Amino acid sequence: MTNIKSVIEKSMKAIKNKGFKGQINVFSTESKNASFSNGKLEQLTEGEKGAVGIKVISPDGRTATASSNIFTEEGIMQAVEKAIEMIKYTEKDDANDISNDEEFTYIDWAFDTDTKDMDLHEVMNLAQELEKKAKSEDERIKFVRGAEYEVALTRIHFGNTNGLYKNALFTNAAGSISLAAIEGEDSSFGFDYQLSQSYRLIDIDRIVKDSVEMAVSGLKSEVLSSGRYDIVMSPFASSMFLGTLITPLSGENVYKGKSFLKDKLGEKVANSSVTLLHDPMNGSAPIIASFDNEGTNTSRFNVIENGNLKVFLHNIYSAKKLGAKPTGNSFASVESPNPSIGTINLHFIANKTRKDILN
């Protein structure tokens, strides 16, 4: 498909001519990937995958979605027709709507030409180097389950029947490793990964060091007694912890009564030292976005500030239901092209650090 914008305009015109509102997300990712395990090349791939997500809303608020991985005008129009056909089976709800955020910031600092232009042989060499360095880092590393390196170029196009058209282009590089340390009868698993906008920011030596330290530190480990401890969470553990907060902070879950935070807006929900920031346009983050996949412009805001819950994460639907404004937190992907509430670059702000713990 040579002119995606033209096809988006045609598909939205077809929806509008039926008297409906609609939106479309088009994702395309070109990637190169290599992985090694115990000295053997396990995977070497280069290719492109894509997906199209369609949402249609009737005048009485019924809505239906459809998706397709056929990147032709015919394939996209078939998805549109499928969504229109399904809409009669859904319930009326006047909170279903589309964005009218016309202006947006085109992000060009998330694209790295050298990362885009890396060939498959270079990617393979980096994956192999990652494995070799891990094996030589410590004699107790006996087994590398997987050393992987990948570079990708992603294109995103969004349009709707209000005439919006927004697009983004960005690169990513990622390195990861999983390995095992063995000493006598003891064994322990370690892993680490990095994701960035450019291959230059992937530090293979750091990945090796952190994964080996994790594996070796688990040898001859002991189970702690139950109690209250000061802890320092690794970046991976922190990300898993933050992931558990997205569900209760979702405006849809609040509206449906599924969140334990539903009556806590404006109240203290955490220690005063806790500030939780959503910062989707942070230039140093591995993934950034100036608009979400409903076309709402993103922004930087505190979800929790000094322990107080300031705002929920909203898409257009939940914002209308709760009398709020959309926060730009409706995201989709090439794997799931119709959006749901999520975050990009959600992280804690360190108000105070106990140096006596870290030292």
Predicted segments — roles?
Residues 1-359:
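N-terminal small-residue-enriched
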